[in-house]
Amino acid sequence: MANILVINGPNLNMLGKREPEHYGRQTLGDIIEELETLADDYEVRLYNFQSNAEHEIVERIQTAIDDIDFIIINPAAFTHTSVAIRDALSTVKIPFIEVHLSNIHKREAFRTHSYFSDLAEGVIAGLGPIGYQLALAAAVEKLK
């Protein structure tokens, strides 16, 4: 059975309350609950991790090297700033899909660049919470 890790970056713990015009009204808990149901259907193990701290995300990626087959990551604000998370993903060489609830290319200019997209298997942006479900489906397909 494949192991898939979902990583959510800073402020995503505030989903449902924070800027619903950009991020929707679902909470992160709602999104993860839906993913867990889908993971059961796909017969994969799903692990969830959220942190507002860059170093904690780096450490979780590093510990994934031994038992995780695929990563789905929404780096949130770290998308545009974190060489450290990029280096961690590059080091472990675990395939990953980058997910964004909003379309980062329709936002402020500083939000349009990602430090991860060129390393990712794919990028899903602007589709809201369903983007996570699409990423999980794609991860399962890529692991076949």
Swiss-Prot record:
This is 3-dehydroquinate dehydratase. It catalyses: 3-dehydroquinate = 3-dehydroshikimate + H2O. Belongs to the type-II 3-dehydroquinase family. The gene is aroQ. Pathway: Metabolic intermediate biosynthesis; chorismate biosynthesis; chorismate from D-erythrose 4-phosphate and phosphoenolpyruvate: step 3/7. One of its GO terms (biological process) is aromatic amino acid family biosynthetic process. InterPro entries: DHquinase_II, DHquinase_II_CS, DHquinase_II_sf. Pfam families: DHquinase_II (PF01220). Substrate binds at residues 74, 80, 87, 101-102, 111.
